[in-house]
Amino acid sequence: MKAQVLHKYDPEMKEKVWVTEQEMPDPKLEKSSDVIVKIGAAGVCRTDLHIVEGAWKHIQDPKGDLLPMVMGHENAGWVEEVGKDVTGFKKGDPVILHPIISGTDGTCLNCRRGLDQHADEGAFPGLNIKEGGYAELLKTSVRNLIKLPTVLAPKDVAPFSDAGLTAYRVVKKATRHLLPCLLYTSDAADECSG
């Protein structure tokens, strides 16, 4: 597959080209919950520029062995292949990918509490693992897929896989605390409104 690869950090951001296109091996299913996604679009955000300049090298690459790597953590595309335990997704389904992959497939305590950002063995494609979405294919976990309606194209939603899903999660968690009476019955809505 073709991929855009970062080979060196550029602290001064003066290089004319930061990534180069090269052939990489296609990702392979390893776990029964793995999914290979054909990337339709990958967003670029300020985080990517911080990666290029090495601003987070002390966090994401403390040993200095992460490069070369394929960047890209804001990804959307179509399901290409699914592991044997994957249900609810099939080849061709349009999806957006949550950027954090839990190494425990959601079974660790933090994931069960809805704190995936603190997942045990968590991986962040294009940030702390070498395989990101600036490629034709990306391996992820079924837990990280959100099926898209067919009226949405991956190019229209890829940037939302980071900032958009982050905001969505905050709203989803907050709503149960803001209007708790709405969670029980529709009759309670009249009581809440006054």
Region annotations inferred by a language model:
Residues T47-L49:
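Cytochrome P450 core scaffold surrounding the K-helix E-X-X-R motif
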Residues G64-L66, H73, S102-L182:
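NAD(P)H dinucleotide-binding glycine-rich loop of Rossmann-like/cofactor-binding domains
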